Amino acid sequence: MKRRNADCSKLRRPLKRNRITEGIYGSTFLYLKFLVVWALVLLADFVLEFRFEYLWPFWLFIRSVYDSFRYQGLAFSVFFVCVAFTSNIICLLFIPIQWLFFAASTYVWVQYVWHTERGVCLPTVSLWILFVYIEAAIRFKDLKNFHVDLCRPFAAHCIGYPVVTLGFGFKSYVSYKMRLRKQKEVQKENEFYMQLLQQALPPEQQMLQKQEKEAEEAAKGLPDMDSSILIHHNGGIPANKKLSTTLPEIEYREKGKEKDKDAKKHNLGINNNNILQPVDSKIQEIEYMENHINSKRLNNDLVGSTENLLKEDSCTASSKNYKNASGVVNSSPRSHSATNGSIPSSSSKNEKKQKCTSKSPSTHKDLMENCIPNNQLSKPDALVRLEQDIKKLKADLQASRQVEQELRSQISSLSSTERGIRSEMGQLRQENELLQNKLHNAVQMKQKDKQNISQLEKKLKAEQEARSFVEKQLMEEKKRKKLEEATAARAVAFAAASRGECTETLRNRIRELEAEGKKLTMDMKVKEDQIRELELKVQELRKYKENEKDTEVLMSALSAMQDKTQHLENSLSAETRIKLDLFSALGDAKRQLEIAQGQILQKDQEIKDLKQKIAEVMAVMPSITYSAATSPLSPVSPHYSSKFVETSPSGLDPNASVYQPLKK
């Protein structure tokens, strides 16, 4: 009997298990595990008086910091730590303690259940409701049993760290959307260039491509689509069909496959032939410089974290390289799909390799004739863009200079007005000081006059009292004198009548009384003179009271002058602020002017380098004439000839077999 080998690839299929019971048992076990973990953590919190669930976000934060340091560098990790610390401090200061603990615990348990494989379903929602109910009904009010000061920073971290991660997620989402938009724009441009390339092909190849498209559409309409068909964003391509294709298409497919692997490693979309390596090295340098300038423009518009900036640079560089090299690679729809990332099956790959080995190398010459001019045509675009940028920068420079001149004129006018205002302020200050001195002297004189008036009024009252008292005494003396005279007359008459004695004593008494009367009259005259002087002083004081009204007028004038000086000081401070703003604007304009000049110098240097490299490439490029004797297709006329190349003073040999750069 013959010995038979078993086919290891055809293994016996295992028996089908009941997935319904498996899912039920697995989900119930999973949710029971969640409940057990939750109960254990709550028990540990109650026993040890610490919220252990707050340590889980802290552990996530440490892991994210380690990952950012490992994959994105120290600068981004430090920035991430600073942002998270700031968010934690804000939550710690501005959120009340009870609401902080409630939100932190609720978020931790909801996020823990959310990380399961089930997603949003009835058990997860029920667990969320249970957690929220327990936190709101029981633990929201019982904060006395815990170390509040120790748990509060961790609770703030449980809220601040998710806010930071949500912010970074939103930023990455926005950058992803912008990147998709850019990819769509590049895809449209590639399709446009693909159509141009298809229209530039000879009519025979166009007919072959039309037949291939019809066959592809027919293959798409079949119901039995195999798993070997790969879907791409530009269209699906069947990988298992066997059609008679020409040699250029097969070569483009093979080159697209080989270069697609390199593009995944280096993020470059350039697929060149092995024959064009010395020529394409210079072309790649020019395209790299153009892509570097375009990536700078995109980086100015899309400001973000370092990770997203690097991703956007690589994405824009790959898309621009793909667009510039589309003339070399994308000459058929199959090569276009291969460069965009679709990979054919192994059977079609072996078939294409066998066909490629059997064909002649004449098709490489045709490809060179079709590829080189399209790359050469894209070279002046960089110079045109750089010249446009230089014109824009020169216009900005002139505008900034005009603004600088206007600002300088405004500063000079403001400085002159400031000098005038300062002189006026000095005069007003001197006048104000004089008025204040006068006012001070007037106030002092007024106080002294008030004191003198009060003293004189007291003296006047005393003099009036003394006068009234003296008048009373005088009246009494007159009455007494009259009585004495009457009694004396009676006594004289009686003495004359009765006796002629005691005449001398009476005469002496009369003399004394007359002397006293004279003294009293003299005192009366003195008192009257004093009363007249006091009345004159009272009149003078009344006149002074009338003069006080003039001092009030001076006070009102002084207050008006003070208001005016305050207004002038405010206007002077406002003008100084405007002057400072103008100086800051002048500094900004100078800085922008220096930046623009630096950019102009950089652009001039780049233009010189590009012109030098283009001259070297054109000097190295010989005139291409190839014979197509063995090719069944008609030769394609080249789109570029070395006769149209401008003569440059380069010292390179255009007829050299291998390009060798000059040694300096």
Swiss-Prot record:
Entry keyword Transmembrane helix: yes
Subcellular location: Nucleus membrane; Cell projection, Axon; Rough endoplasmic reticulum membrane
Major subcellular site: nucleus
Membrane-related topology note: Multi-pass membrane protein
Residues covered by region (Disordered): 253-274, 320-375, 630-664
GO MF, any single term: microtubule binding
Name of the molecule in the record: Macoilin
Source organism (scientific name): Homo sapiens (Human)
Top-level taxonomy: Eukaryota, Metazoa, Chordata, Craniata, Vertebrata
